[in-house]
């Protein structure tokens, strides 16, 4: 599925006009568009045999043209997962840059092609429309050794095998919100917890460390991704279990994480209501790993002033927040149970040595802001 937002990018902050979801995974692919209040503005379904080469994307453009009337669409901004070494900030897309981004596919084999497919589709449907790529790796581009380094031969590092980090558009948005919500706190850990999950050590507003590495497979336990594991497991699977590279890739990306451990679901909501012991064990492993990595991030910054929860699980799963914070009591983290249950913005108990906040993320707004800056700056 593809999520999208339509923004006015007038003289100040971009303003959301509507948002939608394009879902081509269902038996009847569909688009649903709503206004910021949630009121439905448009819905269209197609049978699979009606779907064109570009699916429902052409339908979105047609609807947007009617919706905007005389106010033309000026650009499309894309979230691109991997920018590699060379792309440290948003860029205007052309054939050269698209080719360069496609070459990074081995670093994000499942994500990068899905990011670039809409770029190619827009290029075909609206060849004159400006397209802008915003990178999930860019927020972490300032990482320096040791946080950016693997313990591998330096010759490999010189060829780009290093820790890049991801979820940067989410971390960027939350970091901007924290300048208002917690302006005096300089050592924060942002926990983006969803189907994909990672942490960022935010020191003086900049990324100082993060849990994902070369690829989005690294770090925390995720919905279907394994996170950090002993690399020797990969050798064992190939040498002793005779698994192919493709089989190992599928196992690590699509068959591990919460789904693999629980055998029930990759969805935390399902696991929280399940009576299966393995579901509870998957949750326990998830919270154990998050808490352990929060401690690592605190070590990077030599302390911890605040812990921020965001992402689908981080924003909505009070029980998960409680379990993580209980594991961090030794760091002085204390939750207010009532505030946590309500999903309040601030959920730390009086006397907690660490501030704890829930901050909804907005990656679409980060993209809209970058698009506006590039369009205003011009070529």
Range-by-range predicted roles:
Residues 62-74, 178-182, 294-305:
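Phosphate/pyrophosphate-binding loops at sites that engage ATP/ADP/AMP, CoA/4′-phosphopantetheine
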Residues 139-239:
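Glycine-rich phosphate-binding loop of actin/hexokinase-like ATP-binding domains
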Residues 305-328:
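Glycine-rich phosphate-binding loops at beta-strand->alpha-helix junctions
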Residues 344-379:
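Structural signal for terminal/edge beta-strands and the immediately following C-terminal loop/tail
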Residues 2-50:
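Short glycine-rich, Thr/Ser-proximal phosphate-binding strand/loop in the N-terminal lobe
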Residues 60-111, 130-132, 138-149:
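Short beta-strand-loop/turn "lid" adjacent to the catalytic site in phosphate-handling enzymes
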Residues 250, 257-261, 268-300:
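Adenine-nucleotide phosphate-binding core of ATP-dependent small-molecule kinases
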């Amino acid at each position: 599925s593809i999520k999208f937002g339509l923004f006015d990018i007038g003289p100040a902050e971009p303003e959301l006009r509507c948002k939608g979801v394009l879902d081509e995974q269902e038996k009847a692919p569909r688009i649903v568009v709503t206004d910021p209040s949630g009121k439905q503005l448009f819905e269209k379904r197609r049978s699979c045999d009606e779907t064109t080469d570009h699916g429902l994307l052409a339908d979105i453009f047609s609807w947007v043209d009617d919706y905007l009337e005389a106010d033309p669409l000026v650009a499309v901004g894309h979230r691109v997962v991997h920018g590699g070494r060379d792309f440290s900030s948003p860029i205007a897309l052309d054939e050269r840059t698209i080719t360069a981004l496609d070459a990074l596919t081995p670093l994000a084999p499942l994500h990068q092609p899905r990011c670039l497919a809409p770029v190619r589709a827009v290029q075909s449907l609206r060849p004159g429309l400006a397209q802008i790529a915003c990178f999930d790796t860019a927020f972490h581009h300032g990482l320096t050794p040791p946080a950016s380094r693997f313990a591998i031969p330096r010759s490999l590092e010189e060829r780009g095998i290093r820790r890049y980090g991801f979820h940067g558009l989410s971390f960027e948005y939350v970091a901007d919100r924290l300048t208002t919500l917690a302006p005096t706190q300089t050592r924060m850990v942002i926990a983006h917890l969803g189907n994909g999950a990672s942490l960022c050590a935010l020191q003086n507003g900049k990324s100082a460390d993060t849990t994902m590495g070369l690829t989005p497979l690294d770090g925390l336990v995720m919905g279907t991704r394994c996170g950090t594991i002993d690399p020797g497991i990969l050798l064992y699977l190939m040498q002793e279990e005779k698994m192919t590279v493709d089989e190992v890739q599928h196992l690590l990306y699509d068959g591990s994480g919460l789904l693999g451990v629980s055998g029930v679901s990759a969805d935390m909501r399902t696991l929280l209501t399940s009576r299966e012991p393995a579901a509870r064990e998957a949750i326990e492993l998830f919270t154990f790993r998050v808490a352990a990595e929060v401690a690592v991030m605190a070590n990077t910054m030599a302390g911890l002033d605040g812990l921020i929860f965001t992402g689908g699980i981080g924003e909505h799963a009070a029980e998960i927040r409680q379990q993580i914070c209980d594991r961090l009591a030794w760091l002085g983290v204390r939750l207010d149970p009532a505030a946590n249950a309500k999903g309040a913005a601030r959920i730390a108990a009086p006397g907690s040595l660490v501030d704890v906040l829930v901050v909804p993320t907005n990656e679409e707004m980060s993209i809209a802001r970058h698009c506006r800056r590039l369009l205003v700056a011009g070529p």
